[in-house]
Amino acid sequence: MHPAHLLVLLGVCVSLLGAARIPPLPLSLDDFSNLITCANRGSRSWLDYAHYGCFCGSGGSGTPVDDLDRCCQVHDNCFGDAEKLPACNYLFSGPYWNPYSYKCNEGEITCTDDNDECAAFICNCDRTAAICFAGATYNDENFMVTIKKKNICQ
């Protein structure tokens, strides 16, 4: 093996060792899934809401199919407001990737005081949505409704 190849191989190995020690970045989406579990006391996973109605999950359009879907519409609007805050205006990330601090105690969610302005705003958006989800009726027919009824969300 040529010495240049050994140098490249050594560089790759060192890079991989360094990368393995980098802890994963906590994300607002991870926090939101935990708040959902907290508010509904583990009765439903965040995955149950990922493709529900016209507004739960990525994007959103049309008219909400029910109260639960309306919770998602309000959450989308809240994040839209967060994106307009100077404190939440990040070049490549925005509020969806900003972690925040919170406490969960027997279904009660508290956004902690150590959050910066953007994290506090996002935490309150997610907290409000999680509580709304827990209080709304889940209709299995509205899960993946955009696939079942193609034109429902236009």
Curated annotation (Swiss-Prot):
Cell compartments where the protein resides: Secreted
Enzyme class: hydrolase
Catalyzed reactions: a 1,2-diacyl-sn-glycero-3-phosphocholine + H2O = a 1-acyl-sn-glycero-3-phosphocholine + a fatty acid + H(+)
Cellular component GO terms held in the UniProt record: extracellular region
Origin: domain of life: Eukaryota
Active site: H75, D126
Cysteines engaged in disulfide bonds, as pairs: C38-C104, C54-C153, C56-C72, C71-C132, C78-C125, C88-C118, C111-C123
Protein residues bound to Ca(2+): F55, G57, G59, D76
Entries under SUPFAM superfamilies matching the protein: Phospholipase A2, PLA2 (SSF48619)
Keywords of this entry: Blood coagulation cascade activating toxin, Calcium, Disulfide bond, Hemostasis impairing toxin, Hydrolase, Lipid degradation, Lipid metabolism, Metal-binding, Secreted, Signal, Toxin
Xref: CDD domains: PLA2c
One Pfam family matching this protein: Phospholip_A2_1
Cofactors, names only: Ca(2+)
RNA-binding as UniProt keyword: no
Assembly description: Monomer.
Family label: Belongs to the phospholipase A2 family. Group I subfamily. D49 sub-subfamily.
Protein name (database record): Acidic phospholipase A2 1
